[in-house]
A protein has these predicted regions:
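Transmembrane alpha-helices of multi-pass inner-membrane enzymes
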Residues: 16-19, 67, 452-512, 516-518
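Alpha-helical transmembrane segments of multi-pass inner-membrane proteins
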Residues: 144-155, 196-312, 433
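Hydrophobic alpha-helical segments of polytopic membrane proteins
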Residues: 15-16, 20, 29, 34-44, ...
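N-terminal hydrophobic segments of proteins, predominantly signal-anchor/transmembrane helices
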Residues: 70-176
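Long extracytoplasmic/lumenal interhelical loops at the membrane interface
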Residues: 340-412, 431-440
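A membrane-periplasm/extracellular boundary helix in multi-pass inner-membrane enzymes
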Residues: 5, 208, 213-220, 237, ...
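A conserved mid-to-late transmembrane alpha helix and its immediate loop/hinge
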Residues: 248, 252-254, 287-291, 295, ...
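Hydrophobic transmembrane alpha-helices and their immediate junctions
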Residues: 271, 278, 303, 307, ...
Length: 518
């Protein structure tokens, strides 16, 4: 039996029980069962097409058709997109061009989903009078300024019409569409619950795959590239202290850690949507997946996200006390176990595994600051060709900019970096105001806001340890959009409460007392 069929069997053996769990926990409680079943069928269909189609373009056609089918019948486009976001790796190839145009754009699963689902939703939203037009919020203009600046500065290196159009289309797909739809799609609280639950369950499904790849030293999805006739450069089987660094469907171990850290930070937002038992068991699985990712930057980001979420809003002291006791218990248990030294070796700051990475990052910062100083305002489009950067070239023949802030400053200068950081600050300020508004209206909304705020802070830390590529830009823009939408929902809810003159709270989903599927 070929590797791809063996991998598919193992993936289905882990994923089918997870899909059944989704139906038991979320069906009709958070997500309408008919919509959930449709999304799960599309999920399985896309996975099977990736492994069995034997041709990339046939896989694209089948996947696109399944996405369009689900989208045409579902009322929550962002939830559909998030449900199908991590089905397969972002295996990439070029859409061929014609004449003097060598290719149109690069295409992969992420861009296909953005084009089919979010593109459809964007066109539909533009015709709806109830949807706020683009430009209604300050965050809209900051997002537009950052995306437009990248296009304008790209003119310095390749001022051809074809290249500018290609760059604009790719930024529209990767940045504008996820941000716009995420910031407008949830017109009410049930729709927001649907989006959060869909996103977090999609991330949760990566956890058993990550643990399996770590434990068995077998990357399950690398055979997809060969099955589709592609030679995508995924740098397979990178080892850390004798263990393979998992990829799951993220395409990169650092990106996988980032995704799982986002899930860990955001998971408290769905606390009220499931039983206590199911929430704790699924959260433990998610944390286990994060630990197995071997991404130390993600460890730090997830920890900060949890602390910020716990330390914000009403009852912060109680939450932090419980968190401290739980953390102390875990530390004692690990210290007394025979794996204490091995666990400590993987930890950031105190671990002794791959210490050369720390040295490389320090040198990268020093060299990058010298290069930035030459073009401080708008950076340089050819910074990789600078002689100073050559000393950072690694054995693989690449210069890895493992710090997104440095990468932005090198390419767009302090102007671009300032706009980029401002996007986060404005999004977090809006989330903070939403938390304060919801404190007297809805404990559920307050919890969602705390999770959003903590996760955004964690993201800002993690991107200082990784390049921003593959699914990372999509997730960041989605988080910015969700933060804006959350703020607007709390504003609308507060205004409705004041208008009614009633001190009632927004009703929350009832917690089931009977044991559910775990």
């Amino acid at each position: 039996m070929s590797e791809q069929f063996r991998a598919l069997i193992f993936i289905l053996a882990m994923m089918l029980p997870m899909l059944a769990m989704a139906r038991a926990i979320l069906g009709d409680r958070v997500i309408p069962m008919v919509d959930l079943d449709r999304r799960l069928k599309a999920w399985v269909g896309i996975l099977l097409s990736a492994f069995l189609a034997r041709n990339f373009w046939l896989y694209i056609i089948i996947s696109g058709a399944l996405m369009a089918w689900v989208m045409s019948k579902d009322k929550n486009p962002m939830a559909v997109f998030l449900s199908l976001f991590f089905v397969v790796p972002p295996t990439t190839t070029f859409i061929p061009g014609f004449g003097p145009i060598s290719y149109i754009i690069e295409i992969n699963h992420l861009r296909l989903a953005s084009l089919v689902i979010l593109g459809w939703a964007y066109l539909k939203m533009r015709r709806e009078k109830s949807v706020e037009p683009f430009g209604a919020y300050m965050l809209d203009w900051l997002a537009l300024a950052y995306l437009a600046l990248q296009v304008i500065l790209f003119l310095r290196s390749d001022p051809t019409v074809t290249t500018i159009l290609r760059t604009s289309v790719e930024l529209f797909i990767d940045g504008f569409l996820p941000y716009f739809v995420a910031s407008r799609a949830a017109r009410n609280i049930p729709a927001l619950r649907d989006m959060l639950a869909s996103f977090l369950f999609a991330i949760l499904m990566l956890a058993p795959i990550t643990i399996f790849e770590f434990g068995k030293n077998w990357l399950l999805y690398t055979s997809i590239n060969e099955a589709l006739g592609l030679g995508w450069d995924v740098m397979p089987y990178i080892m850390r202290n004798g263990n393979v660094r998992p990829y799951a469907t993220a395409g990169n171990s650092l990106i996988l850690g980032f995704i799982l850290a986002v899930g860990v930070g955001l998971y408290p937002a769905v606390r009220s949507m499931m039983t206590v038992r199911n929430w704790y068991l699924s959260y433990a699985l998610l944390i286990g997946g994060l630990c197995a990712s071997l991404a130390r930057g993600a460890y730090v980001g997830a920890t900060v996200a949890i602390l910020v979420a716990a330390g914000t809003g009403r009852g912060a002291g109680t939450r932090l006390s419980k968190l401290s006791l739980g953390a102390a218990f875990v530390v004692v248990v690990i210290s007394l176990s025979p794996f204490a030294d091995q666990v400590a070796s993987y930890l950031p700051f105190i671990g002794n595994v791959d210490t050369d990475n720390v040295t490389y990052r320090t040198r990268l910062f020093d060299v990058s600051m010298q290069v930035i100083a030459m073009n401080p305002l708008f950076g340089s489009s050819n910074f990789m060709l600078d002689p100073l950067m050559e000393q950072m070239r690694q054995g693989q023949g690449i210069i890895d900019i493992v710090n997104s802030y440095l990468g932005i400053a090198l390419g767009t200068g302090y102007v671009g970096l300032g706009i980029y950081v401002s996007i986060y600050l404005v999004a977090m300020a809006k989330t903070w105001m939403g938390i304060r508004r919801s404190a007297v209206v809805s404990p559920e909304l307050e919890g969602i806001g705390r999770a959003l705020l903590g996760t955004n802070v964690g993201i800002m830390i993690i991107i200082a340890t990784a390049s921003c590529f593959l699914s990372m830009p999509f997730i960041i823009w989605i988080m910015m959009g969700l933060s804006l939408r959350y703020s607007q929902l709390t504003t609308n809810l507060g205004a409705a409460r004041v208008g009614q003159g009633a001190p009632t709270r927004q009703p929350e989903p009832q917690r089931r007392r009977t044991p559910g599927a775990a």
